[in-house]
């Protein structure tokens, strides 16, 4: 339903929490904790790849995030378990008179694997979006994490002219930092068009994968034919991929192709895209 502008700006805020935990029981990864407060939910867990990988789809029923909304998501993957978390569609941050926030805390135990593969986040012009992500890995825990951000609504010709987008991302292994990132982009900011910023591209994406790959696979990743401006960097114990794109679908397609190449090499399993991505 489309609300008049005045109504949309003053819709009551949501405070929502979702807490998840996964454990290995024999040969099966099972959800052992699923607690929610407010409109955040997960759908029934799936085993599309067999019992070892537990897939959950996180949904936010109101359909979007507005001023005053506060979302908190935490997920813990215990030793030997494998969880894959995704979303049914784009997360939308609407224009608002005050900030909205999302806090994400992910913990992965030794021998465990977490894939965090949400669909894109669309930040409308005049939204005030503030995202904080903290990921803690222990021992040989494995991670495949991505995020896709679209500022404004490129498909509708809307530029990000007002409001702000802020994101903090921290990744640790055994308490030692692997990756720290701080972003803050204001509506109409010069960084949106600067060659040292987004260079006129409204969409940017980040991929973090634990592990290291050989030069041959790195070149195969770099040679992917896609209409994005992307590259990869191999750091000690961490592979980082970044891209700029004119559309979120382009960035997502690039990340999925990287996932198809990297998942067998770094996680030991062929990539099988969740069915929800095709709906």
Curated annotation (Swiss-Prot):
Location, primary (coarse class): cytoplasm
Protein name, entry field: Urease accessory protein UreD
Subunit structure: UreD, UreF and UreG form a complex that acts as a GTP-hydrolysis-dependent molecular chaperone, activating the urease apoprotein by helping to assemble the nickel containing metallocenter of UreC. The UreE protein probably delivers the nickel.
Role according to the record: Required for maturation of urease via the functional incorporation of the urease nickel metallocenter.
Gene symbol of the encoding locus: ureD
Subcellular location per the Swiss-Prot or TrEMBL entry: Cytoplasm
GO annotation, cellular component aspect: cytoplasm
Domain of life: Bacteria
UniProt keyword terms in alphabetical order: Chaperone, Cytoplasm, Nickel insertion
Family per similarity comment: Belongs to the UreD family.
InterPro entries xref list: UreD
Keyword Cytoplasm: yes
HAMAP family assigned to the protein according to its UniProt record, in alphabetical order: UreD
């Amino acid at each position: 339903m489309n609300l008049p502008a005045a109504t949309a700006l003053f819709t009551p805020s949501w405070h929502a929490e979702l807490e998840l935990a996964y454990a290995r029981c024999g040969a099966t990864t099972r959800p052992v904790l699923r607690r929610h407060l407010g409109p955040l939910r997960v759908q029934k867990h799936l085993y599309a790849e067999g019992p070892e990988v537990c897939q959950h789809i996180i949904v936010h029923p109101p359909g979007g995030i507005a001023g005053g909304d506060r979302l908190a998501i935490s997920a813990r993957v215990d030793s030997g378990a494998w969880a894959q978390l995704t979303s049914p569609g784009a997360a939308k941050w609407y224009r608002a008179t005050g900030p909205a926030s999302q806090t994400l805390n992910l913990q992965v135990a030794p021998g465990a694997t977490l894939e965090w593969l949400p669909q894109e986040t669309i930040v409308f012009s005049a939204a005030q979006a503030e995202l904080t992500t903290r990921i803690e890995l222990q021992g040989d825990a494995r991670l495949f994490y991505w995020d896709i951000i679209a500022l404004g609504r490129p498909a509708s010709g809307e530029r990000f002219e007002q409001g702000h987008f802020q994101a903090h991302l921290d990744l640790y292994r055994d308490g030692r930092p692997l990756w720290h990132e701080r972003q803050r982009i204001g509506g109409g900011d010069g960084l949106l068009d600067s060659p040292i910023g987004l260079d006129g591209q409204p969409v940017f994406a980040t991929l973090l994968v634990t592990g290291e790959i050989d030069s041959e696979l790195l070149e195969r990743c770099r040679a992917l034919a896609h209409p994005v401006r992307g590259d990869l960097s191999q750091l000690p114990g961490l592979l980082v991929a970044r891209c700029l794109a004119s559309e979120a679908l382009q960035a997502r397609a690039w990340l999925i192709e990287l996932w198809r190449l990297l998942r067998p090499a770094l996680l030991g399993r062929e990539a099988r895209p969740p069915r929800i991505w095709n709906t």
